């Protein structure tokens, strides 16, 4: 069984036991989070939401909070001696999907 959930402005396909990296959530490591924005549930029977599946939830355990690798952002305007170099590390949350209730 799998589901498509909406979190952090993105739609993510998840299965039970899977480890996923999502946009940062306000939860500590070891806590359990529940997603109620379930857009689709697949498996033996298919349920499509309009826009979400009524009564469907996905439960996950927070493994850790972290920051992704650094990317370099560079702005440059030719002939004007204008440039700006900046680094950015996006925060993320690592989850393990425990249960899909449909």
Swiss-Prot record:
One of its GO terms (molecular function) is structural constituent of ribosome. Pfam families: Ribosomal_L21p. One of its GO terms (cellular component) is ribosome. Keywords: Ribonucleoprotein, Ribosomal protein, RNA-binding, rRNA-binding. One of its GO terms (biological process) is translation. Part of the 50S ribosomal subunit. Contacts protein L20. PANTHER family: 50S RIBOSOMAL PROTEIN L21, LARGE RIBOSOMAL SUBUNIT PROTEIN BL21M. This protein binds to 23S rRNA in the presence of protein L20. Belongs to the bacterial ribosomal protein bL21 family. This is Large ribosomal subunit protein bL21. It comes from Bacillus velezensis (strain DSM 23117 / BGSC 10A6 / LMG 26770 / FZB42) (Bacillus amyloliquefaciens subsp. plantarum).
């Amino acid at each position: 069984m799998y589901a498509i959930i909406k979190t952090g402005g993105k739609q993510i396909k998840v299965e039970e036991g899977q480890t996923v990296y999502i946009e940062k959530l306000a939860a500590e490591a070891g806590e359990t989070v529940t997603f109620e924005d379930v857009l689709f549930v697949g498996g033996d029977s298919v349920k499509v939401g309009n826009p979400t599946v009524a009564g469907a939830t996905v439960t996950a355990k927070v493994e850790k909070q972290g920051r992704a690798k650094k990317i370099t952002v560079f702005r440059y305007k030719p002939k004007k001696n204008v440039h700006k170099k900046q680094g950015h590390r996006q925060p993320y949350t690592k989850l393990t999907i425990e249960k899909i209730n449909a």
